[in-house]
Amino acid sequence: MKKFFMMLLPLAVAVSLSAQEPYSVRMIRSEMKRNPDATYLDGRNGERKWNYTTGLELKAFLDAAGRYEMPEVVQYVRDWADTMATEKGEVYKYKKSNYNVDHICPARIYFDLHDMYGDQDKRYRRVTRMIREQIDSQPRTKSGEFWHKQVYPHQVWLDGFYMALPFYAEYTRRYAPKEQRDSLYADIVHQFTAGAENTFDPATGLYRHAWDESRSMFWC
């Protein structure tokens, strides 16, 4: 019986240590084990793609790494970021002319990387500056809301708020001239309030996923 309990002891210790790890850390370790290279996240199979799914997941990785001191996770994110952007700050296959708000979201990790490595590598600041330029010329509805994409003219999507506005707000906080901040923050708030007004369905009390100002798309 004593030998039996001695055999179980290492297993019990391992289970105990695992239980002490936050689920966020355990999830990250699982993702990194299954995808040693972040280009394999979201089923990309090693294909580089500037997309919100990978960018959003890696932003969560960075947040957890900062909370729980995991330098290997930071390096994992940085490897992907450096693969996606040249030293000049040019992003792989990114085209501003597509005016896709989904392509604003992944740039958020470059704020964090600039804070950590900006003295060594200027690309992180250059990426955020370039993505910010898209916001300046992003097509809008008559009421001032961002189109979701150039290929979806006049359409405002609820998920577009999250794709663009956290980046827009963070960039404003960090870099906008003080005299411009109030108007920029007001623009951010307007995206939410106007979007909510135009997507709200009084019949159900819910918000539709999207609104088409031109009324040409049947589903929104």
Question: What are these regions, as identified by a protein language model?
Answer:
Residues 55-71, 105-120, 165-180:
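Well-ordered alpha-helical scaffold segments within catalytic/enzyme domains
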Residues 89-92, 96, 100-168:
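Extracytoplasmic mature domains of secreted/periplasmic and thylakoid-lumen proteins
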Residues 21-40, 75-93, 126-145, 185-208:
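Long, well-ordered core segments of solenoidal/helical folds
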Residues 158-220:
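Extended ligand-binding clefts on enzyme/binding-domain cores
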Residues 20, 53, 73, 120, ...:
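Residue-level preference for long, well-ordered alpha-helices that form the structural scaffold
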Residues 1-20:
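Bacterial Sec-dependent N-terminal signal peptides
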Residues 51, 55-58, 67, 71-78, ...:
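Generic alpha-helical scaffold signal
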Residues 20, 28-55, 85-104, 148-161, ...:
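Solvent-exposed loop and edge beta-strand segments that line ligand/cofactor-binding
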